[in-house]
């Protein structure tokens, strides 16, 4: 993808903690070869979004996503991490749980704050009796309301949700 993704306009702190180095040595060459094969570059999205959109579009086919990126590995039922040389299998329930847990604890790699002072154990206790994703969403939104003033809670919840959510269609 070219340029910054839409998340930067939603969340000015998105990935602000990263120290970007020079682009990979052969990136321009790879881009040219992909272009020669008919691939298109799309602005405003991250590779995670495009991979998951493609996966959703062709959901009738079994797929395994190959990536070292922890974000994408956490949202796929089947994936392979080439850095660790390991396969990962996640149930739909685990994928949902990982997303909503990040809404509570944040994501340090992407500089998403979550709810200060709340960690994985808090998430586990909070959602222990939740029956479905809607129940989890409601519980977490209520925690944002409890922690922040109402306007700030809505703003933070929305900002974090859109920063964490992968576009899949």
Where are the language model's segments positioned?
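Non-catalytic, usually N-terminal nucleic-acid engagement modules in DNA/RNA processing proteins
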Residues: 1-11
